[in-house]
Amino acid sequence: MTTDSSDPAKPAGPGQPPGSGADTRPGGLATGQDVDPATIETDEDDEARLPDVPDEPTDAIAEGPLAVGRAAIEHAVRHAPTSPGVYRMMNAARDVLYVGKAKNVRKRLSSYARPTGQVMRIARMIAATSTIEIVSTETETEALLLEANLIKQLRPRFNVQLRDDKSFPYILITGDHWAPQILKHRGAQSRPGRYFGPFASAGAVGRTITALQRAFLVRSCTDSFFEGRTRPCLLYQIKRCAGPCTGEIDFPGYTALVREATDFLSGRSRAVKEELAREMEKASGDLAFERAALYRDRLAALSAIQSQQGINPRTVEEADVFAIHQEGGYSCVEVFFFRTGQNWGNRAYFPRAEKSFTPEEVLGAFLAQFYDDKPPPKVILLSHRIEESELLADALSIKAGHKVGVLMPQRGEKKELVAHALTNAREALGRKLADTATQSRLLQGLATVLGLPHAPRRIEVYDNSHIQGTNAVGAMIVAGPEGLLKNQYRKFNIRSENLTPGDDYAMMREVLERRFKRLLTQKAADPDKADEPEKDAVPQWPDLVIIDGGLGQLNAVRGIFDALGLSQVSLMAVAKGPDRDAGRETLFLPDRPAIKLEPRDPVLYFIQRLRDEAHRFVIGSHRKLRRKDIREAGLQEVPGIGPARKRALLHHFGTLKEIERASVADLGKVPGISAESARKIFDFFHTRPG
């Protein structure tokens, strides 16, 4: 989808490059989450792993609980309206078991009270039901939208669960500056400009923006960075920006580049490529071979974008394509996004659903939740025919403000798109099942090596980082049967002010005490649920804690656990080998001889990966904290840099970020900065944390 966001505020004036004149774009305040493509990280979410789908019990359910559940339902039926609404079935602890909607709530609830004919899943739900709450709605479409919202919010055990509420990224070409910027954007589309999307992932946006910069030379820097330039930055040197900040291109020329980029993203790619080809031929005919080569490179960048897109349909302008595949009790929904006739990526989802759900049931529930907080396209193409497709289409049409079609194509190009999505769903689920099986074998092998009673379902790995005690931070990563659970990573800014600089033991003590005191507090507040797994079967309590270090670190952590009264959590320390060689690590466990595994042992490689991931995460957290500290302090903390040199550096580089990126040689080119001072500045920004 391409959208415009305009602001009636007074236009902002240009930064006076040649030819800018008074012709400006609308001004306005920048809001939303705008992201420099250079800083894009891989999206992480619950859908990166398979949900836990327990086997359904085959034992008959006792008549007593069923009778109690039916009695609760019959009581609700007597007071239920015959109008549309949403109902919530809850157990005695008032946990929501199921959220449903109905055109006639009383009739729907009556169907649960029948003494026979219920499938096992429904019977188990009835047996657990203690109370029912009802919310009436004006229409059935309103009930459908409310049901989807409540399922995402409450995550009931007996519903299909999407397990992902992240918004999708868009490409934004800003409209509040005379020299528009191209960037990734998430969130409310309140900043003036043109929005193109949604894209399947931040990575897809980053790759597209990089290629667009090569093709159209549109800037990606922030407005503050732009305004502070006195010379072109590196992106100009590598031909990924036209350099409007310092007048390397005039206003009409840059406006033409932005228009071409907008036309390309709006689906007019053929016209843009034909125009660039004409310009290339003209430059070649004029013997301006350097200019012709620039047009050639821009055409190649556009071709690279289109080759990454794969399928670009001829008859589908704007559509989302959904296909579902079930195997081994799991479901995979593959989604392809087509906008302006272009394929803007695809993504696999693994919704949580009990094994008795049919593909049609899973897909229908998935769609309602998927569009709960996302704008629907004009057409939604499906691999399976879902119930109430017309109701869903009506609800999404009301939500979008335009007609939305929900179709299961039978022939032609649309059918081919669905078949392609179905192939991708089948392959994605196959890969995920294989990865999960490998992870399961590694966890079982780890349990065997360490003598654990069972394969760990939750492993927590801890590390800390600092430079001579400053900007100290601890970090925890989490792994389980589905791999690394990045949405459960945590960082701990060290709060203690009386720590001896570099006291790793004290830092680790603070991190572990904060982590496990919180768990103990939660257990005391709700002892009945303390040992239950969280939703999606990730326990709160770890089976195994791993720390980076030797016997001394292990004994220190053991003392912390003894003081907290923790005995159910297994501990292990991983000490690096001689010369810090990977493959020669020693494993330390309480009251057991040290363990050395063969360098090629898969379990050792798995442990190394966990330790290295913890180190990567804590180093990244430390650097973010340190950069924030440095930027707040400016250059005042750099030894030997007074006000005059500070002004010279900022005048030469424009921003503190550029000073941080500069090499020793670049720093030495600044007037008044000696080779010794350049080395001090470089070392200040690049000293490796401990």
Swiss-Prot record:
Compositionally biased tracts (Acidic residues): 41-58
SMART domains: GIYc, HhH1
Keywords: Cytoplasm, DNA damage, DNA excision, DNA repair, Excision nuclease, SOS response
Keyword Membrane: no
Annotated compartments: Cytoplasm
GO biological process, one term: nucleotide-excision repair
Pfam families: GIY-YIG, HHH_5, UVR, UvrC_RNaseH, UvrC_RNaseH_dom
PANTHER family assigned: UVRABC SYSTEM PROTEIN C, UVRC/OXIDOREDUCTASE
NCBIfam families per the UniProt record, alphabetical: PRK00558.1-5, uvrC
Subunit structure: Interacts with UvrB in an incision complex.
Name used for this protein in its record: UvrABC system protein C
